[in-house]
Design a protein with these regions (language model features):
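N-terminal glycine-rich FAD/FM-binding segment characteristic of electron-transfer flavoproteins
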Residues: 1-257
Length: 257
């Protein structure tokens, strides 16, 4: 109930999680491989002196997991030693589990939050978004270098909001300053696996594909039919985004009434 812990920040949450694990005598600490989980869990693992497996896609044993490696081109098996296992789970890698009996919830007291954590909470409160987290969204619409400038992402934002999804971007678009870096999808950005991924004006560089090729359905829109993105797309449209996106927005609006 502490307001200072309302925002999921590593500086405030990691020490509290590590302390709770110690007091409970827990053998595992699990979380999602979202930007929040990837920020908090490694710090908690360090405070616990525990090993960690990130972005796991399968559980082999209590301390053994599978996770993607080499830009998603290989699957490696990792084993964590020690008495505590910390792991972040790729959300879309596991199907929903069958309902079971409700577990007991234990309420624990938390320690004091330092001044730095309190300041970061105040900053975080001004940066909330109405869209779902990029790593958890069922629909992701991403734009690439072909969008040319940041203001052109407005049309992608409109489509994104109509579909109830999250906005993403290629590294080229993020590096060019068109969008904030936290929207970057790829090997050095966010790894996503939504039900629907729409790639607009994205060439399909290997580092970008590593971050989205786990998507269930991939739609590519690009004016160049030779771009690599079409090799992984389930559906492709060869056209300019200036023509394709407004037309797609109009059709979605019709369907939504």
């Amino acid at each position: 109930d502490d307001a200072k812990l309302e925002a999921p920040l590593a500086e405030t949450w990691a020490p509290q999680l590590a302390d709770a694990v110690k007091r409970a005598g827990a053998s595992a600490l699990l979380g999602t491989a979202s930007s929040t989980g990837k920020d908090i869990l490694p710090r908690a693992a360090a405070l616990l002196g525990a090993g960690m497996a990130s972005d796991i896609t399968a559980v082999v044993a209590a301390n053994k997991f599978k996770r993607p490696a080499y830009a998603g081109n290989a699957i490696e098996e990792v084993e964590i030693g020690g008495s505590v296992v910390v792991a972040s789970v790729r959300q879309t890698a596991f199907p929903p589990s069958a309902g079971g009996a409700a577990g007991a919830v234990e309420t624990v007291a938390v320690g004091a939050v330092d001044a730095l954590g309190a300041e970061l909470v105040a900053l975080h409160a001004t940066q909330k978004s109405a869209r779902p987290d990029l790593g958890e969204a069922k629909v992701v619409v991403s734009g690439g270098r072909g969008m040319r400038e940041g203001k052109n992402f407005k049309v992608l934002e409109e489509l994104t909001d109509l579909l109830g999804g999250a906005l993403g971007a290629s590294r080229a678009a993020a590096d060019a300053g068109m969008v904030p870096n936290e929207l970057q999808v790829g090997q050095t950005g966010r790894v996503v696996a939504p039900q629907l991924y729409i790639a607009v004006a994205i060439s399909g560089a290997i580092q970008h594909l590593a971050g989205m090729k786990g998507s269930k359905v991939i739609v590519a829109i690009n004016k160049n039919p030779e771009e690599p993105i079409f090799q992984v797309a389930d559906y492709g449209l060869v056209d300019t985004w200036e023509k394709a996106i407004p037309a797609l927005i109009a059709e979605v609006k019709k369907l939504k009434g």
